[in-house]
Amino acid sequence: MEKYLIELLETNNRVIVPDLGAFIIRQQEPQELVFNDLLAFNDGMLTAHIKQLEGISMSKAQVKIEEFVDQVKKILTNGDIFHLENLGFLKMDDSSKIEFSVTK
């Protein structure tokens, strides 16, 4: 999933992972990648990207996203950190809010 997120962030300033949140590139100098767990609606962009690259149906692409989100939430709920290769990591704070830190 990280590969798809990175590909989309190369041409978009926001990528929403449905039911998880959005990765957003702030356009100030220096550019910064942030995460907003309030933007978790399905805008279809990630699903369509996976569909196109893998040659699968929209529903199968959506299932891939749902499985990824379930995996992330399970790890975070257990108090562990979820690493997003070449992006950073997600963790849950004491108030159950998902936080993102960029890999340095």
Language model features by range: what are they?
Residues 1-104:
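Cytosolic/nucleoplasmic/matrix-facing N-terminal domains/tails
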